[in-house]
Design a protein with these regions (language model features):
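N-terminal amphipathic/basic-hydrophobic helices that include classical n-h-c signal peptides
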Residues: 1-26
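Active-site flanking residues adjacent to catalytic metal/cofactor-binding acidic residues
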Residues: 34, 118-119, 145-147, 196, ...
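Active-site environment of divalent metal-dependent phosphoester hydrolases
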Residues: 152, 201-203, 295-297
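Active-site histidine-anchored catalytic micro-motif
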Residues: 112-180, 282-286
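Catalytic cores of soluble, metal-dependent hydrolases
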Residues: 18, 24-114, 125-126, 133-135, ...
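Solvent-exposed alpha-helices and their adjacent loops that cap or buttress functional pockets
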Residues: 24-26, 134-137, 159-160, 184-188, ...
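Active-site glycine-rich loop that binds ribose-phosphate moieties when present
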Residues: 160-190, 194-203, 216, 223-226
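Short, glycine/acidic-enriched loop or turn micro-motifs at the edges of active sites
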Residues: 149, 200, 248-252
Length: 326
């Protein structure tokens, strides 16, 4: 059960309310709300508290008030009997298998899955679920909106941080046991991956990315020029479904002052909304994930929660109003 909100909605009254939108398929759209309240394999710790903070701030009520037919929230869980001490990546994969189960169920009964994730490692389970529910052979594209590339492997990473590896794992360049545990049988083609809002890459990581077909649209070019629009158009033509992943550290630290991996010169909330909307309007988005919200640190955490709510409220009408993928 989610505790009463400590995020004052009167104080945060400038959070835009989602507006009802006609989908052409009836009065509402089905969205399954999935939460993955974990940092790695630890429930509710640090970033793992982010999903519950969004629930407490009233996100489900806001969605329903906008006419969204919302099921859930359904929480992905790591069975304690399957958790092995010292095998974090394998544990994350097993958690991902439950995330995949929930996402696949959402795709089979509704239009899309909105995933509130603790950290970026949840993405492997989300994509696994999309692939399990999709027609065999259907291409799935990934739009990764993040200050960081998250394209490290154990060989390229300076830190060994697992949260810096999810995109490389999705692409099949690392983590085979992790992918297998999550049920992701086939990797995502690198030509079907767009990194957007990127502004911090490790040297070896960038070299690895440049050796692939992954397209990078840096933060400095995201809202200027046609690069992002062209990248999304190309992805839409090549893929049956898209997965939109948003790491909130793509925002400038003044909007997410509690971010665990802050990166200067980030996006404004309006720029993030514009970026998300461009993807959501394609009609190909099957799942959206919001990750890396740190609600701790007192007033700084509260401001970060408010920023996340603003971004979701600003962008989601484009998803509601656009027919989704089959």
């Amino acid at each position: 059960m989610v505790a009463p909100s400590r995020y004052n909605r009167d104080v945060d009254s400038d959070i835009p309310r989602l507006q009802p939108a006609s989908t052409g398929r009836g009065s509402s759209m089905r969205v399954d709300l999935v939460t993955v309240p974990y940092r790695y394999d630890e429930r509710g710790e640090g970033l793992g508290a982010g999903p519950d903070a969004l629930l407490a701030a009233g996100l489900p009520e806001q969605l329903r008030a906008a006419g969204v037919e919302l099921t859930g929230p359904h929480e992905a869980r790591l069975n304690p009997s399957l958790q092995e001490e010292g095998r974090t990546a394998l544990n994350i994969g097993r958690l991902g298998a439950d995330t995949a189960r929930l996402v696949a169920a959402a795709r089979r009964i509704g239009d899309g899955a909105l995933v509130l994730a603790g950290d970026d490692t949840a993405a492997i389970g989300v994509v696994s679920g999309l692939k399990q529910a999709a027609v065999e052979g259907a291409a799935i594209g990934v739009v990764w909106v993040d200050a960081h590339g998250d394209f490290n492997t154990p060989e390229t990473s300076f830190s060994g941080i697992l949260a810096g590896m999810p995109v490389a794992i999705l692409a099949g360049l690392a983590g085979p046991l992790w992918r297998e545990a999550a049920g992701l049988a086939t990797p995502v083609e690198t030509e079907h991956i767009v990194l957007a809002g990127t502004r911090e890459l490790d040297e070896k990581e960038e070299k690895l990315i440049r050796s692939t077909d992954v397209q990078i649209v840096p933060a400095t070019e995201l809202c200027d020029g046609d690069d992002f629009a062209q990248a999304i158009d190309r992805l839409t033509r090549r893929c049956a479904q898209l997965y939109l992943h948003v790491d909130l550290d793509v925002l400038d630290p003044r909007f997410v002052p509690s971010a665990s991996t802050p990166s200067a010169n980030g996006l404004s909330i309006d720029e993030l909304v514009t970026t998300m909307t461009a993807v959501l309007q394609t009609g190909k988005v099957a799942a959206v994930a919001i990750s890396s919200l740190n609600p701790g640190a007192g007033a700084r955490g509260e401001r970060s929660v408010t920023s996340a709510m603003k971004a979701i409220a600003g962008a989601l009408p484009a998803w509601i109003a656009t027919p989704g993928p089959c």
